[in-house]
A protein has these predicted regions:
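Conserved, well-ordered alpha-helix/loop/beta-strand core segments that scaffold catalytic motifs
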Residues: 1-19
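Surface-exposed, proline-anchored Ser/Thr-rich loop/turn motifs
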Residues: 4, 194-195
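Beta-lactam-recognizing serine transpeptidase/beta-lactamase-like catalytic domain environment
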Residues: 19-21, 26-87, 91-193
Length: 195
């Protein structure tokens, strides 16, 4: 498939332990294509030679081989949980707009980082330009500005933010018609402290 072709090319250029690609119709959520790496041959599903060298295979215990096979057979698109990363930003903005803690014309000065408790969360601009400077809400989304989103989340507060996560379906199964679907990882309020 086209997806698998590009996935193999990507992994040759930037080797990874696993890769998951899902192509969806953004209008209705229909899955148009899906691929997972590493791949295995359905005609020879126990062949690990495409993933491990002869030396690596020779040094593996039976348990290691079994675990390697399970990893090889895993559909990483549905059976693993991943942090949503910047795809979370539109949901943060939507919650902020709905609750009135941010408005379309609002600006925020990105200094390149924001502290959440003791942790410094950097903006991707931190290593290049240091910061985005003053941004509108639209520019914050366009530039994927982490500090602006943190500012919105702080204004929402942990309880409201967690309520919106639940309303948007984060942490829940999608109901895809494939076996082994994992749920997302969500922290309960007891594990989240106010900044």
């Amino acid at each position: 498939s086209i997806i698998e072709k590009y996935m193999v090319a990507y992994n040759q250029e930037k080797p990874s332990k696993n890769t998951a690609i899902v192509v969806m119709n953004p209008k209705n959520g229909e899955i148009l294509g899906m691929a997972s790496y590493p791949q295995f041959d359905l005609n020879n599903p126990r062949n690990l030679a495409n993933v491990y060298s002869e030396e690596q295979l020779a040094s593996m215990s039976d348990t290691d081989v079994t675990n390697a096979l399970y990893q090889l057979w895993t559909n990483y698109c549905v059976s693993e949980s991943y942090e949503p990363g910047s795809t979370y930003k539109p949901f943060t903005i939507a919650a902020g707009l709905e609750e009135g803690v941010v408005h379309d014309g609002d600006t925020y000065e990105c200094k390149g980082y924001e502290y959440v408790g003791p942790d410094m969360i950097k903006c991707h601009s931190y290593s290049t330009t240091g910061s985005h400077g003053v941004l509108t809400l639209s520019q914050a989304l366009e530039n994927s500005c982490n500090p602006y989103m943190i500012n919105i989340a702080i204004k929402l507060g942990n309880v409201r933010f967690a309520q919106y996560e639940k309303m948007f379906g984060f942490g829940a199964k999608t109901g895809i018609d494939l076996p082994g679907e994992a749920t997302g990882i969500m922290l309960s309020l007891i594990h989240i402290s106010e900044p």
